[in-house]
Amino acid sequence: MRSDMIKKGFDKAPHRSLLKATGLKDEDFDKPFIAICNSFIEIIPGHKHLNEFGKLVKEAVRAAGMVPFEFNTIGVDDGIAMGHIGMRYSLPSREIIADSVETVVNAHWFDGMICIPNCDKITPGMMMAALRINIPTVFVSGGPMAAGKTSKGDVVDLSSVFEGVGAYQSGKISEEELKDIEDHGCPSCGSCSGMFTANSMNCLCEVLGLALPGNGSILAIDPRREELIKQAAEKLKILIERDIKPRDIVTEEAIDDAFALDMAMGGSTNTVLHTLALAQEAGLDYDMNRIDAVSRRVPHLCKVSPASNWHMEDIDRAGGISAILKEMSRKEGVLHLDRITATGQTLRENIAHAEIKDKEVIHSLENPHSEEGGLRILKGNLAKDGAVIKSGATEVKRFEGPCVIFNSQDEALAGIMLGKVKKGDVVVIRYEGPRGGPGMPEMLAPTSAIAGMGLGADVALLTDGRFSGASRGISVGHISPEAAAGGTIALLEQGDIVCIDVEERLLEVRVSDEELDKRKKEWKRPEPKVKTGWLGRYAQMVTSANTGAVLKIPNFD
């Protein structure tokens, strides 16, 4: 066993003595040591119940004849961090999480790991660590939150609350109505109830094969999640016995399938960023062109909030992720069904008995929302390395208009609220990329303000930053190269005409190459917004969004 490094041999007497101080007995040194990587934190509603989850996981690991050791990672709640400097720490926290898990697990030579994530950056951070460490691992997330209902019976979620702010600001609802939405938008523990980033990543974790069937859709408060925990411990023991590791599971084909599900569900645009980072950790050559190829062959089968009024509980009721995959498997060339997963079985075996129970929620191949996926990769002179749009969350497929340029999210939000944006405009928020932000903050507040003011179908928004999974409308993010790297978005001037063509996958500014070259020569890189601390270091080391915004290791040659 891997853990023999710290528990076997006469020279490990000091190690065993320390381990006995934690409560271990001599007989425990013949059992696998299992890291329980938890992310309990009280300020995040998606994680406030994970302390109890950790206890259940440890009980299940002991029952399976192994020895559990629990530790915690940090976490950032993107909703609470939204709209202020806290959002700059969200994406960088993914790297801290990955590094901290790597540190604890490799320092103590665990034989296997169970990860308990839930919200936005915690899940991909742990997945990156699992691929980096590469020991048998099973994920079991905390589960989605239930949707809420206002006193009028309207179904609401966190997206409704953000959009309610814009609606109140524009006089469309009263303060009492906003308070009603606020009080009911987040009714329970769990990851926010729509197809936002957290739920998108937990669903992708399931289809990748690192988590068990049901992981993405079973609610946090559903007793079936406790059964999932028991299964996770049992399956981990099998993975250890068979020496099946994350890099055996997360292959190029598995990532294809993850993006296929993403396209079928119209997931968060952040999945592109995080899954590209996973590919980097797995040592795979995977780029945005391959994502685009998946998008072209996968139909959009279900719309979940913010693209509709359906939520994760509805997906679960309709058959869950397995039912979506089973329906997708009917189309040749969409899924790779014979690859291994954390169940110890193939994807084909995992979904064999799944079926759609509500075709209003999960559409059939014969009745898709669209013939192509709910995410699209755009390219053009404004995004030479690519950009991402959640095409399933807007009915507008082509938009052309003049730029209204803001050099920060705060500046943009103030401008939108003051009425500086009108129908037909293209809002540009730049210098908010991985390096320029720094931290590539999400633009949920501006998109929600636009939607809440009734301009969602009449105003486009472009940024080198990110969007929350709760964002909707004509929102194009992850524009690469970013402004801080001298990308074309930095060269835009007020009034330039921009064209967004979703069907043709184009993002263009109607300015000649000669004029752009002239502007590039005159452009000067702004001073970094942050020069000290973690964000200062992050800004110096982070790569572009089109490669997952991972940290680059300096060349010491």
Curated annotation (Swiss-Prot):
Question: Could you tell me which pathway this protein works in?
Answer: Amino-acid biosynthesis; L-isoleucine biosynthesis; L-isoleucine from 2-oxobutanoate: step 3/4; Amino-acid biosynthesis; L-valine biosynthesis; L-valine from pyruvate: step 3/4
Which residues are annotated as active site? S468
Q: Does the keyword Lyase apply?
A: yes
- In this UniProt entry, the residues modified to N6-carboxylysine are K121
- Fetch the InterPro entries from UniProt: Dihydro-acid_dehy_C, DihydroxyA_deHydtase, DiOHA_6PGluconate_deHydtase_CS, ILV_EDD_C, ILV_EDD_N, IlvD/EDD_N
Residue intervals passing through the bilayer = none
Name of the protein in its database record: Dihydroxy-acid dehydratase
- What UniProt keywords are attached to this protein's entry? 2Fe-2S, Amino-acid biosynthesis, Branched-chain amino acid biosynthesis, Iron, Iron-sulfur, Lyase, Magnesium, Metal-binding
Reaction catalysis annotation: (2R)-2,3-dihydroxy-3-methylbutanoate = 3-methyl-2-oxobutanoate + H2O; (2R,3R)-2,3-dihydroxy-3-methylpentanoate = (S)-3-methyl-2-oxopentanoate + H2O
The free-text note explaining how the cofactor binds reads: Binds 1 [2Fe-2S] cluster per subunit. This cluster acts as a Lewis acid cofactor.
Member of which family? Belongs to the IlvD/Edd family.
